[in-house]
């Protein structure tokens, strides 16, 4: 999980989720996991 100020989709399989006012990027590839912080 990378914590970034701006989260972007890295590949086509990535998708954005809003969970408890946090933006998350979730993907099949675990290296693409990101959270806005």
UniProtKB/Swiss-Prot annotation:
It is found in: Plastid, Chloroplast. It comes from the Eukaryota. One of its GO terms (cellular component) is ribosome. One of its GO terms (biological process) is translation. GO terms for molecular function: structural constituent of ribosome. Keywords: Chloroplast, Plastid, Ribonucleoprotein, Ribosomal protein. Transmembrane segments: none annotated. Belongs to the bacterial ribosomal protein bL36 family. PANTHER family: 50S RIBOSOMAL PROTEIN L36, CHLOROPLASTIC, LARGE RIBOSOMAL SUBUNIT PROTEIN BL36C. HAMAP family: Ribosomal_bL36. This is Large ribosomal subunit protein bL36c.
